[in-house]
């Protein structure tokens, strides 16, 4: 026998007006039994459950509505419902936060489908932070990967992914992301931040190429201790290839920076020998001319 929808709605409304919410819910349930995909009626049930203080029931009902809206392509409506769930949890039942930890990733997915990248990033950031707090580092890495995909030119997500890799002892992954972050920071003119990241990278792996970049940045900054810092980095490069012209050139600059002119000259002499032995005649002449100006004897 078909249900008289209008009659049921009127009966439910009368119960609501009398604040007999449980009776109203029973009426609405009759409509839902006839049509389990009736999102509007489910939403009314959730609202009444919330008014009654039956927050776990309200959350469960709202989640059903959110899923229906998502399936029906109503992303904005789904987002509103999922946000309502999060507000109820935060305000009334924080102990349910972990059980409904899947809501934030769902929100991120919906935001992304609408092109709302900044909102998606905020939701994913929350997920990653929660996972790290729970020491679920492998799962956090997957979320950080998504953040990097969504915001590839921002150095911060790369840095956070690098640190996440570091926590699980994935040196290769950490070094790659530290390298990317440092390069982006240097490109943005944030030299001091780039150097901090390069120091973290070199702590994980003595990479000659990155050590050279760090040395160049220290020498460009030119503060009192930067010459010594550059020398420390150039030792890595020198050990990897003691006859590399670029490394020798930076070594000469570093010695000059710390006031050791004699050592700078010795390094330039070695540069001249390397240039001569490798057939770089023009470079050899240039170095010799420079040496004759600074050390004619």
Regions found by a protein language model. Give the residues of each.
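Repeat-based scaffolding regions
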Residues: 1-297
């Amino acid at each position: 026998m078909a249900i008289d929808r209008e009659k049921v709605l009127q009966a439910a409304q009368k119960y609501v007006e009398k604040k007999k919410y449980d009776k109203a819910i029973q009426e609405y349930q009759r409509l839902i039994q006839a049509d389990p995909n009736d999102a509007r009626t489910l939403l009314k049930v959730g609202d009444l459950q919330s008014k009654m203080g039956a927050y776990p029931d309200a959350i469960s009902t709202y989640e059903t509505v959110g899923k229906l809206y998502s399936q029906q392509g109503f992303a904005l409506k789904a987002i509103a419902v999922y946000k309502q769930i999060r507000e109820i949890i935060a305000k009334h039942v924080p102990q349910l936060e972990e059980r409904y930890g899947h809501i934030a990733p769902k929100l991120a997915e919906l935001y992304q489908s609408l092109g709302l990248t900044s909102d998606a990033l905020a939701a994913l950031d929350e997920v990653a932070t929660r996972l790290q707090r729970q020491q679920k580092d492998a799962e956090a890495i997957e979320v950080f990967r998504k953040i990097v995909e969504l915001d590839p030119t921002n150095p911060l997500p790369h840095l956070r992914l690098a640190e996440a890799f570091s926590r699980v002892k994935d040196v290769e992954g950490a070094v790659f992301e530290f390298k990317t972050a440092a390069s982006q920071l240097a490109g943005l003119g944030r030299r001091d931040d780039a150097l901090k990241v390069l120091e973290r990278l070199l702590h994980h792996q003595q990479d000659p190429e990155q050590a050279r970049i760090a040395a160049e940045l220290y020498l460009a900054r030119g503060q009192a201790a930067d010459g010594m810092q550059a020398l420390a980095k150039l030792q890595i490069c020198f050990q990897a290839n003691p006859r590399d012209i670029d490394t020798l050139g930076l070594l000469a600059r570093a010695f000059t920076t710390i006031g050791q002119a004699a050592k700078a000259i010795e390094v330039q002499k070695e540069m001249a020998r390397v240039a001569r032995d490798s057939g770089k005649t023009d470079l050899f002449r240039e170095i010799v001319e420079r040496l004759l100006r600074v050390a004619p004897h």
